[in-house]
Curated annotation (Swiss-Prot):
Biased composition, class Basic and acidic residues, residue ranges: 1508-1521
Identification of the protein by name: Latrophilin Cirl
Broad class of where this protein is predominantly found: membrane
Disulfide bonds: 695-722, 710-724
Entry's Gene Ontology cellular component terms: plasma membrane
Biological process, per Gene Ontology: adult locomotory behavior; cell surface receptor signaling pathway; proprioception
Length: 1693
């Protein structure tokens, strides 16, 4: 490494000053001396040898001689350099000889550059001090500001450890702060009136005299970066030299001025490595010939450009005057010295305080003010307000007239935020040495000196005297010298005891001296040294103490070892807790390390613990107070020309030594590699606002801390545990965190912090949306285990995101830190467990019957809950019991301490759950692949596709979540260790976490067609949402029902309206009345009807009579006007609604209740005040107007067959509903309470009944346009093919065509869920079919088409095959001569309701009275199975031709046999009244076996039918597996329900029984009941309570009603007419079939004698027709979404 040259000036006061300079060259290098042209060299003195230990001693060798001198050195130099402009001399022993072998020498020359014409120089300055001119060693302390330029000394020390500062570090062609080329600097003895300049290279300018020395500029004693390169441009002429007596304060301000050659150059910040040189540097153009002028100079003048960090101060007008007075450091007192005012950039030099020899120095620099100073940064825009310069300033260079003025303003703006400051915090007294320590140094070098006496005196001096920086260097050197001499002198003592005693005493003195140096009272002495010297002194102290300790260990004999109870140690711990109970720092050496370093069975170990050494052995840039260092480093580029340099961008990593220094050494050497690492436990000195601990050791060679060979095992708030594979001095380094930023986000840059907030926010929002979707739209989802699993997963993820967001904002000192870590641990374990259970559930679904029908699995879900949360809480509890501190010892509140407990309780469980989830996922894929190769039915294919999609999404979900958690973990670990890859993991976490939230929303919400539909409905139904979301081109989505005012009940909408149609039955006056027209609602589209939110309610407005129609508004009384047998009510008067949400379905499951703008007709009023309504057909107002321009009445429409036949058929839309008056109370009947219930309104929908008293709302099921109407009496007129006589062929062809279309439509369904739903409808419909009935005879003129009418069964849009003959009860109107009869549908129950299915035979009165329910029921079931066999086995419904007479006769025989079987079953029920319960159970078992066999036979026949359908390319009729499952479910329920009936059976009144249990010889359809989730928990309990209550009070029927009661009132209420008949029409039709007396007699008998035996009523006289009040039943089905769908049975013709 090349040395560099530096100049140190001594202050001279003279009118004619000659510069005195000093040059050095290390041994083996060439000393070059050069003066300016016209000047010659005048040597004063020279020496080849060594007078200082610091010059040319980069490695700090203290054993060289410092009294080495070659006497003829000056003569040799004079022969080479005297009176020459330049010369070069090689510093080598071949030139000068070897005055001191073994010592590295250097050549030192003191000279002057004088004019060649000058023969003598007269000066008035005082003589230099003797130590300058003498041959003795200079009192320049270690590295006393001597910088070695290239080519002169050893290599330069390494650059300071500073991070790269943007905009400051110099690059090629632009030297910056840390890339300073070697240059010569001058140190000025700073008196206010002194003015000298030292020019680099030893060239003297302006005739000034100076002394110069050499210095190395690469490092600073204060650890700060060296100053930037300063340029001082000169324009010299031999004869043109300004007067040296001209004061600088009188220099004019302004543009280019002539200034003396000795004008100072101001600097901005810090100087070179050691403080012996000022930043007053000048730079001349090399080898510039005489007479040439520099750029920008004025002829005849010497122009000097003054700069601070390349800022032209001449342009700023600061070359003199009052502005320059601001750039001075004020006078102050420090270290018993008075420091006078000093110019910025100068170094104030003065003699050391009293009692010490040498010089003291202190530099004045510019430092930026603190943020609270109130000064603002410079604004470049302010330059626009700079006044224009005067014209006189632009005479010589008009092109550069404006820039100097603008530049002056810029400089003023930049400099105003800075203030002159003494730097460093204390003066540099490295060269100050006390006289008594100099005396001790002389004594120790004497041969006959007493080492013990010297050591005692040294300990006394260091404890009682004031020391300076130079004294530290001398003291540590004496300690090493004493130890070396004692090592040689101990052999002169023959007595072992005397030898040990002397060395023990010497060690005590050395330890006392070291303790005195580290005492707090001597802290100022350490601060007198620059950082480099501090490190050297500390290293020397450590090595000296260690050397003396080993000296004692070598001296003590083995017999002197104290005896212990056990002499064999597995390990050694220092310090011993018994001896040092207050120490918390520990070093533990393993046994293997002791054995490897033993000698003769003994091991020499030296332990040392140092106090306050951590304040000396500081890392770089921490030698002065933290506030000043932060300000200094932040403003290193204070005056850079680059205006983009922002001080805030310069980020400095401040590190401190945050533990005591503890040392351990073995006898073989200092750096011994150990076979097993040692363990150190070090206590943190500072616990607040510190982070990132690092285990380090002190490197003796580099004089710095190093982390090689040491690693951090664990850490917490107070301690850190380290592991090192070698021995030396150890400590902990930690980063200082700003007090205002002490959370985890301190390691985030601004952008990453914002991105993390955004990422977590997005994920939380989408998780909340998913949870709300599960809650609000619960009717869409099946209440299954999968839904519960995903709900739990989302809850865990939400907790993790929120806890992570809270944890990164907390510190380890926060009270919530430990709790956050605990809950986060539990949430992560629970989340991974739920993922494992989700994969297991998919696997179990594929391996069980759950593939067919996904239902609620409460036991399994409860087991998942127990395993998930139970295991997680157990693991966390165990972790807390073992080591609670593991949750509080980490730096961040989102991580546990990385120890064995962390891996056992966190990593291992998470990995187990993830591996299990992946394993079950792969098993599920294998099973799906196997099933895909086998032949499955449509239902299994649909469910398999759904499960396949769920598994794919779950697997992607699992991988994405793993990526999120792994990236977060590695990011936090990397940021803690300051790893460069931490930012990569951080941005990966941001991306993955955002994708996780988006994936949750897309997977669970967007991809589900049902959810999308519910979202649309939900948006349409809420008026608070913006219209842009709720409105569309064709519909308006929100219907707002107002309850006040005269227009109450109308639908408020903004949709596109059609032309209002005149309601049926409204007179012409009403049509002409504008007020009446306003009350007529405006028809809107179906979307508006579907989107309406109001329930069907009573109009509570005050009663008033309409002017024209005479109707009563707000009541349910029968109106006064009728039209054609129709009793007309005004729309909007009695009821106000266009549709409503089903009370027990989900919020979005809205079904159309009745068509908008249609009249409601009150049929009759029941005994309890019920009013029965139906809505007549509204074909008339949908059809185009005829030529007459008026609307037709229903009778006129149907009488016009030709017009009906030619008009396009519309969808069938008819419905019934029932209302009860609001009694003001709607409480439910309490258990055990007798009497009449508070209100009959609590039967089905307690919530809706409370407000609107609507009990049941069956909505319509539309038939396809073009299908035959459902009106039997008009079927002939509306069906043209029937008139042609080709009905059989026509309907056969139409049936085949429709089945193909339906099959094609099913294949084009939009989703697997829709296919599953369609298929479930078919299966449930066929399984819920009752027994076959005797079909009524067709009209006489249609008798020849009897078989065709039987074939034409109604097909709703969900069917994919024909309904069987067992469904005849379902479409009696169709069989009687009308195809496509109306079917009414409504969702009655969902998750919260308990739905059960019943057969009408279960309520049979005979069986209840005779306690023989089971026999009758199963005989009926056998009849139903027989009907099913004929249904699936025969060809009447297979789609082929069935027009032969033999098939018709066979079908009649089967029907007769079934009728006889029903009669026999009833007789058997009567005959077995006295049988006991055991026999009944046997019969039940026998019937169950027969049922099972029948179902199996039916399945075989069904398979054959399926093959026949497959041959025609049509879908199969049903699913065998589903039918079998449902049959078993029905069988089990029937047994349990019949037992309940027998337990509570009692003689019941006719009116108290359900309507389905009355006399019904033909109707045996399926009915069902619904309870609202209360009572005894099921419909069976509710029905049992109903029976008991009705048995007690027969005249007050109440409680919960079966649905059948609403439509089949038997003897207790009026019947409900079909859609196309009024009661008058029905009575006329019945009177044609039977005499009026028979009907009256039957009706009178039924009402007057309720105590007759039910058997007598069940079998009336064969010539006696049934009463006109025929019962109507409902068919119920439960689809896979747990949705009950009801179908109203049309009344037989």
């Amino acid at each position: 490494m090349l040395p560099t040259i530096l100049s140190i000036s001594y202050e001279h006061i003279s009118l004619d000053l000659s510069k005195y300079q000093t040059a050095y060259a290390c041994e083996g290098k060439k000393l070059t001396i050069e003066c300016d042209p016209g000047d010659v060299i005048n040597l004063i003195r020279a020496n080849y040898g060594r007078f200082s230990i610091t010059i040319c001693n980069d490695h700090g060798n203290v054993e060289w001689s410092v009294n080495c001198m070659f006497p003829k050195s000056l003569s040799v130099l004079n022969s080479r350099c005297a009176h020459k402009q330049s010369c070069g001399v090689l510093a080598a022993t071949s030139m000068f000889g070897d005055p001191c072998p073994g010592t590295h020498k250097y050549l030192e020359a003191h000279y002057q550059c004088i004019s060649a014409a000058q023969t003598s120089t007269t000066t008035n300055r005082p003589s230099p001090p003797p130590w300058v001119l003498s041959n003795g060693p200079p009192i320049f302390g270690n590295g006393s500001g001597l910088i070695h330029p290239p080519g002169v000394g050893a290599g330069a020390p390494p650059p300071p450890r500073l991070p790269t500062l943007p905009g400051v570090v110099g690059i090629s062609g632009n030297p910056g702060l840390f890339n300073v080329p070697p240059q010569h600097t001058a140190v000025t003895h700073s008196t206010p009136w002194s003015s000298t300049t030292a020019v680099g290279g030893g060239r003297l300018k302006g005739g000034a005299t100076s002394t110069t020395t050499t210095k190395h500029p690469a490092g600073r004693h204060d650890g700060l970066p060296p100053p930037p390169q300063l340029h001082h441009h000169h324009n010299h002429h031999g004869e043109d030299t300004a007067s040296p007596t001209k004061p600088s304060s009188k220099l004019p301000a302004g543009g280019n001025v002539t200034s003396p050659s000795n004008t100072r150059i101001l600097t901005g910040v810090g100087g070179s490595g050691t403080d012996d040189g000022t930043l007053l540097t000048t730079k001349s153009s090399p080898n510039r010939p005489p007479g040439t002028a520099a750029s920008g100079s004025v002829a005849g003048n010497s122009s000097v450009v003054r700069t601070i960090n390349n800022i032209n101060l001449n342009a700023a007008g600061m070359s003199g005057g009052d502005d320059e007075s601001k750039l001075f450091c004020g006078p102050t007192h420090a270290r018993n010295l008075y420091w006078n005012m000093t110019r910025v950039g100068d170094v104030n030099v003065q003699p050391c305080p009293g009692g010490a020899a040498g010089i003291a120095k202190w530099r004045c620099v510019l430092m930026k003010r603190m943020p609270d100073s109130g000064y603002d940064e410079y604004d470049d825009d302010a330059s626009s307000t700079t006044p224009a310069p005067s014209g006189g300033d632009c005479l010589h260079n008009s092109s550069s007239c404006e820039p100097p003025v603008s530049m002056a303003h810029k400089v003023n703006q930049r400099l105003r935020n800075f203030e002159p400051t003494w730097h460093p915090a204390t003066p540099d007294l490295t060269q100050c040495r006390s006289l008594w320590l100099n005396n001790l140094e002389m004594r120790v070098n004497q041969r006959d000196s007493s080492l013990i006496s010297i050591a005692n005196d040294m300990s006394e001096v260091t404890s009682s005297k004031t020391l300076y920086g130079g004294d530290m260097l001398v003291t540590t050197k004496i300690i090493q010298t004493v130890s070396e001499k004692m090592m040689h002198d101990k052999e002169t003592f023959p007595d072992q005891r005397q030898r040990e005693a002397m060395i023990m005493e010497l060690l005590h003195c050395v330890v006392k001296t070291g303790s005195n140096l580290l005492d707090e009272s001597q802290l100022s002495s350490w601060l007198d040294l620059n950082p480099e010297d501090q490190m050297r002194v500390a290293t020397s102290l450590l090595t000296g103490l260690e050397y003396n300790a080993f000296l004692l260990a070598d001296t003590i004999s083995g017999s002197a070892v104290w005896c212990k109870k056990s002499k064999i140690y597995s390990s050694v711990v220092f310090p011993d807790t018994d001896q040092w109970p207050l120490s918390s720092d520990r070093i533990e050496l393993p046994r293997a390390a002791l054995i490897d370093n033993s000698e003769g069975g003994l091991v020499r170990i030296v332990f040392a613990a140092f106090d306050r050494l951590e304040s000396i052995l500081k890392p770089s840039y921490d030698h002065f107070d933290l506030k000043s260092s932060r300000s200094y480093v932040r403003n290193t580029a204070i005056l850079s020309n680059d205006s983009d340099v922002n001080a805030g961008e310069i980020q400095q990593r401040l590190r401190i030594l945050n533990s005591k220094v503890i040392s351990a050494s073995l006898g073989k050497g200092r750096h011994i590699q150990l076979s097993q690492p040692i363990t150190l436990t070090l206590k943190h000195l500072k616990t607040e606002n510190v982070t990132n601990p690092t285990c380090v050791f002190w490197n003796y060679i580099d004089h710095a801390w190093s982390a090689n060979g040491c690693s951090l095992e664990s850490t917490n708030r107070t301690h850190s545990v380290c592991s090192c594979n070698h021995l030396t001095n150890f400590a902990i380094l930690m980063d200082v965190v700003d007090e205002h930023q002490h959370s985890l986000f301190t390691m985030f840059d601004g952008n990453m912090r914002i991105f993390i907030y955004i990422s977590i926010g997005i994920c939380v929002v989408f998780i909340v949306i998913a949870l709300l979707t599960l809650k609000l739209f619960n009717g869409v989802f099946v209440k299954s285990a999968r839904t519960s699993i995903y709900t739990s997963i989302y809850l865990c993820l939400l907790a993790i995101e929120l806890l992570f967001l809270l944890g990164i904002e907390q510190t380890e000192t926060s009270i919530f830190c430990g709790f956050i870590t605990i809950f986060l641990h539990c949430a992560i374990l629970s989340g991974t467990a739920w993922f494992c259970y989700e994969a297991f559930h998919s696997y179990s679904t594929l391996t069980s019957d759950e593939l067919l029908l996904e239902v609620d699995q409460t036991p399994k879900v409860n087991c998942y809950y127990l395993l998930s949360y139970g295991l997680s809480l157990s693991v966390v509890a165990i972790s807390l019991v073992i080591d609670p501190s593991t949750y509080t010892q980490n730096d961040y509140c989102v991580l546990m301490e990385a120890n064995a407990l962390f891996y056992a309780t966190f990593v291992v469980p998470v990995l187990v759950f993830f591996v299990a989830a992946i394993g079950y996922t792969f098993l599920s894929w294998i099973i799906m692949c196997r099933k895909s190769r086998t032949g499955l039915k449509t239902k299994e294919h649909t469910r398999l596709a759904s499960v396949r999609f769920d598994i794919r999404c779950s697997f992607v979900f699992l991988l994405l979540l793993s990526a999120v958690w792994c990236s977060a973990y590695f990011y936090l670990r990397g940021a803690k260790m300051d790893d460069d890859t931490a930012d990569v993991y951080g941005y990966c976490f941001i991306c993955f976490n955002t994708l996780l939230g988006l994936y949750i929303f897309v997977f669970h919400c967007i991809q589900n067609e049902k959810i999308r539909r519910e979202y649309r409905k939900y948006v349409r139904q809420h008026a608070w949402l913006p219209k842009c979301l709720r409105c569309s081109k064709t519909s308006i989505s929100s219907g707002i029902v107002t309850g006040n005012g005269p227009t109450a009940g109308t639908l408020c909408s903004v949709s596109t309206s059609k032309k209002p149609k005149l309601p049926l039955g409204v007179s012409e006056e009403a049509h002409d009345d504008p007020q009446q027209q306003q009350q007529t609602p405006v028809p809107i589209t179906e979307d508006a009807i579907m989107g309406a939110t109001s329930d069907c309610e009573l109009n509570e407005a005050q009663q008033r009579r309409t002017l024209k129609s005479g109707l009563m508004t707000g009541t349910l009384q029968a109106p006064t006007q009728t039209l054609g047998g129709h009793v007309v009510l005004e729309r909007g008067s009695t009821l106000r609604s266009t549709g409503h949400a089903s009370p027990t379905s989900s919020a979005g499951s809205t079904h159309l209740i009745f068509a908008h703008k249609q009249q409601q007709q009150q049929q009759q009023q029941g005994p309890l005040g019920e009013s029965y309504y139906h809505q007549p057909d509204y074909y008339s107002w949908k059809q185009p107007s005829t030529g007459t321009g008026g609307l037709k009445t229903p009778r006129e429409y149907y009488n016009n067959a030709g017009a009906a036949a030619s008009s396009p058929q519309q969808a069938h839309e008819v419905f019934y509903w029932t209302q009860k008056p609001n009694s003001g109370q709607h409480g439910k009947k309490k258990r055990g309470a007798g009497g009449v219930p508070a209100s009959p309104s609590g039967s089905l929908h307690s919530r809706t009944a409370a407000a609107s008293q609507v009990l049941f709302y069956p909505s319509y099921k539309k038939t396809k346009p073009g299908q035959p109407t459902g009106y039997p009496q008009y079927a002939e007129a509306l069906d043209p093919p029937l008139a042609t006589g080709n009905a059989a062929a026509y309907y056969q062809q139409q049936q085949q065509l429709r089945r193909q279309q339906l099959h094609q439509q099913q294949q084009q369904l939009s989703s697997d869920e829709e296919q599953a739903e369609q298929h479930a409808h078919l299966l449930h419909l066929q399984r819920r079919a009752g027994s076959q009935q005797q079909l009524p005879a067709p009209p006489p003129h249609m008798a020849q088409y009897q078989q065709e009418f039987m074939q034409r069964q109604y097909r709703n849009k969900h069917s994919n095959c024909d309904l069987g003959m067992g469904d005849a009860y379902y479409n009696q109107g169709s069989v009687g001569g009308a195809d496509g009869g109306p079917v009414y549908e409504e969702i009655l129950s969902n998750r919260n309701s308990d739905v059960q299915h019943y057969e009408v035979g279960d309520f049979d009165v005979d069986e209840v009275y005779n306690n023989s329910v089971g026999t009758g029921v199963f005989n009926n079931m056998r009849a139903a199975v027989a009907a099913g066999g004929s249904r699936y086995g025969g060809g009447s419904l297979s789609g082929g031709s069935v027009s032969s007479r033999s098939q018709q006769q066979q079908l009649k025989k089967q029907q007769q046999q079934q009728s006889l079987a029903q009669q026999r079953s009833v007789r058997r029920c009567t005959a077995d009244d006295d049988d006991d319960e055991d026999e009944e159970e046997d019969e039940e078992a026998t019937a169950a076996e027969q049922l099972h066999d029948s179902v199996c036979d039916e399945d075989e026949e069904e398979d054959e039918s399926d093959l026949e359908h497959d041959a025609h390319g049509l879908p199969p009729q049903s699913d065998e597996r589903m039918r079998r499952l449902m049959a078993m479910q029905d069988e089990d329920f029937k047994r349990r329900f019949q037992r309940q009936l027998r337990k509570h059976g009692a003689p019941l009144d006719y009116g108290a029984l359900p309507p389905g249990a009355g006399p019904q010889p033909e109707h045996n359809g399926a009915v069902f009941g619904v309870s609202g989730g209360v009572g005894e928990g099921s419909m069976r309990g509710a029905f049992r309570q109903q029976q008991q209550q009705q048995a007690l009070n027969a005249k007050s029927p109440g409680g919960r009603l079966a649905v059948n009661e609403l439509f089949g009132h038997g003897n207790s209420g009026p019947p409900l007419p079909p859609a196309n008949q009024t009661p008058a029409q029905k009575r006329q039709q019945l009177q044609k079939l039977s005499p009026q007396s028979t009907t009256s007699s039957s009706s009178h008998t039924s009402h007057s004698n309720p105590n007759l035996h039910p058997h007598q009523l069940t079998h009336p006289h064969p010539h006696q027709h049934p009463p006109h009040h025929q019962q109507r039943h409902l068919s119920a089905m439960l689809d896979e979404n747990n949705t009950v769908r009801c179908y109203l049975e049309p009344l037989a013709k």
